[in-house]
Amino acid sequence: KKCGVGIVNHYYVARMLAGVNGRRDALYAKKIKVLTPNPAHVNISAGGVAKYATNKNEAIQLLEFLASPEGSKGLAAPTFEHPLKEVNQNEIVKNFGEFTPDSVTVEDLGEKNSLAIKLMKDAGWN
């Protein structure tokens, strides 16, 4: 069957273009045009330190490293995600073009969480 439009996170297309799962994926991905809405939703990645962690200082150092340009690039490169703004992107991701993140905050997501779960349940998702 043919499909005119699909919605997918950009990093799946980037993985295909890079041939992570083989040459065939790369050939299919070359037929796809990535369009980014403006503004675009951004998946949230977060880290934290457990209240009773015995190694809090080391955990904080790890989080600080992951939030640094070097750590961000190390996280983003193999997964084809967008790194921090001041870090060079993977070329495939860079070729998708610039985007403006939407203004949704973590607080917004928390406020709408119960409604989202209700909608999913009402639609038959388990």
PLM region descriptions:
Residues 25-28, 40-42, 54-57:
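Extracellular/periplasmic catalytic domains that process cell-envelope and extracellular macromolecules
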Residues 65-89:
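Periplasmic-binding protein-like
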Residues 1-33:
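Ligand-binding pocket segment of bilobal, Venus flytrap-like solute-binding proteins
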Residues 62:
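Substrate/cofactor-recognition hotspot
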Residues 43-56, 74-75:
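A bilobed periplasmic-binding-protein/Venus flytrap-type ligand-binding module shared by bacterial periplasmic
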Residues 11-15, 39-40, 53-54, 68-69:
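Solvent-exposed loop/turn segments at secondary-structure junctions
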Residues 84-126:
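An extracytoplasmic/periplasmic, membrane-proximal ligand-sensing/linker region
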Residues 12, 55-59, 71, 92, ...:
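Stable alpha-helical elements in mature extracytoplasmic
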